[in-house]
Amino acid sequence: HSLVWYFTEDARLSKKAIKAFEGTIKEGTLVVPAAVLAEIMYISKRGKIALTFEETLKTIEEYENFDIAPLDINILKTADRIETEMEMHDKLIVATALYYKARLITRDEQIKKAGIVSVVW
């Protein structure tokens, strides 16, 4: 939910996460896994977040250096090599970060404890 929290300026987003978003937006490329967008679509339909899927896409399009990483065979192969038990969408998000050699902005304890990818929170 960190992307939604960043877009909505939610107080649950940590200061380190805000700094990571802002730093990457200024000086790099922010990779948004397709699995994150699928999760946003799913939870927004259930009323669990304040931002709709369409609003999320519109906000992403406002930034020049946001790249949506597709869920392709490379991500699936990377996910298949992850031995740690986690929910499928989390595994796909971690696999995307691994494939693109990117840090992951998340507060998910299971992902952090797995130690598979560099996490910012």
What are these regions (language model features)?
Residues 51-52, 63-109:
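Active-site neighborhoods of divalent-metal-dependent phosphate/nucleic-acid chemistry enzymes
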Residues 64, 114-115:
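Short, structured coil segments at secondary-structure junctions
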Residues 36:
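Active-site-proximal loop/turn and secondary-structure-junction residues that shape catalytic pockets
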Residues 43:
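ABC-type ATPase nucleotide-binding domain
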Residues 32-33, 71:
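Short glycine/serine/threonine-enriched helix-capping/active-site loop
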Residues 1-32, 46-59, 100, 109-110, ...:
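Short, well-structured N-terminal submotif of metal-dependent ribonuclease cores
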